[in-house]
UniProtKB/Swiss-Prot annotation:
Domain TIL: 29-84
TM ranges: none
Tissue expression remark: Expressed by the venom gland.
GO cellular-component term (any): extracellular region
Cystine crosslinks: C29-C63, C38-C59, C42-C53, C46-C84, C65-C78
Signal sequence segment: 1-21
InterPro entries: Ser_inhib-like_sf, TIL_dom
Provenance organism: Pimpla hypochondriaca (Parasitoid wasp)
Function: May be a phenoloxidase inhibitor that stabilizes or inhibits venom phenoloxidase while it is stored in the venom sac.
Protein name: Cysteine-rich venom protein 1
Family that this chain belongs to: Belongs to the serine protease inhibitor-like (TIL domain-containing) family.
Subcellular localization(s) per the UniProt record: Secreted
Keywords: Disulfide bond, Secreted, Signal
Length: 85
């Protein structure tokens, strides 16, 4: 009986800590961006629309432009490539 009470106590403590840490919350992104847990390490920008990363092919979590748009580094927003300055 004591063993089961201890297991229940551990589960309650872990669940409480996880809910307080907000690990299940998906970050809110700016307009025209979507959150990805594994986005491109070198996303396309107006300045470099077809980046050739010499890095190891890794990904990073964050907010990225939705498909079809690229980042305008001067304005910090995602726009159609045809609108790049």
């Amino acid at each position: 009986m004591c063993r089961y009470a201890l297991i229940v106590l551990v589960v309650v403590v872990v669940a409480t800590n996880l809910s307080e840490a907000n690990i299940f919350d998906v970050p809110t992104c700016e307009p025209n961006r979507i959150y990805k847990t594994c986005g491109p390490a070198c996303p396309p920008t107006c300045e470099d629309p077809d980046p050739d990363c010499n890095e190891t092919p890794q990904c990073k979590a964050g907010c990225f432009c939705i498909p079809g748009l690229i980042e305008n580094m001067k304005g910090g927003n995602c726009i159609s490539p045809s609108l790049c300055p």
